[in-house]
């Protein structure tokens, strides 16, 4: 069973945990998620396509990410998520934390912080090992291609993270 730490509105750990996807959070309580934008030096971005069996946003494009596990730092979580979903070790990549945004869903028990990271890494495609339970393909996309996926409504979280793509230019 996976557990997540519970944070207060200032992103301070409360010392309490919740079961994964339990959605028991009160207003003013949050869990922590991470997103890792991975770029090549040529300015293209590694994006993955969600499997069609996902309950939410199947077939959409996204960057690697997920929830931080109890006791895990944000940085540890993003490194784990990128490794699990793509097989890439970003430990020695350039970059790091960029910004945090907060998502509140009053009365739904699902409030969360999202720490957004950006890494630049010279990626050899043979190094990619996609997590088949999560991903159904990948591409190295330009900023314009990602913007077009977003306009089509098939790129997850774009409005919340678009500035991380703009900052790489």
Question: Model-derived features: where do they sit?
Answer:
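Acidic, metal-coordinating catalytic segment for phosphate/diphosphate chemistry
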Residues: 1-35, 41
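Local beta-strand/beta-hairpin segments that build beta-sheet-rich folds
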Residues: 14-15, 96-98
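A short local loop/turn or secondary-structure capping micro-motif enriched for an aromatic residue
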Residues: 22-25, 54-57, 138
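A glycine-rich, hydrophobic loop/mini-helix early in the fold
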Residues: 33-65
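The catalytic Nudix box helix
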Residues: 46-47, 63-96
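Nudix hydrolase/Nudix homology domain
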Residues: 58-59, 70, 97-104, 109-169
């Amino acid at each position: 069973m996976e557990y997540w730490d519970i944070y207060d509105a200032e992103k301070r750990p409360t010392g309490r945990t919740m079961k994964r996807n339990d959605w028991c959070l009160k207003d003013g309580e949050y869990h922590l998620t991470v997103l890792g934008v991975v770029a090549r030096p040529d300015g293209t971005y590694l994006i993955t396509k969600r499997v069609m069996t996902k309950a939410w946003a199947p077939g959409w494009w996204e960057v690697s990410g997920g929830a931080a596990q109890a006791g895990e730092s944000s940085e540890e979580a993003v490194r784990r998520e990128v490794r699990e979903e793509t097989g890439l070790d970003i430990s020695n990549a350039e970059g790091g934390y960029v910004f945090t945004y907060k998502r509140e869903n009053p009365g739904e028990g699902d409030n969360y912080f999202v720490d957004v990271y950006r890494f630049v890494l010279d990626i050899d495609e043979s190094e990619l090992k996609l997590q088949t339970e999560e991903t159904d393909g990948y591409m190295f996309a330009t900023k314009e291609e990602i913007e077009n996926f977003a306009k089509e409504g098939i790129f997850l979280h774009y409005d919340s993270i678009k500035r991380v793509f703009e900052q790489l230019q």
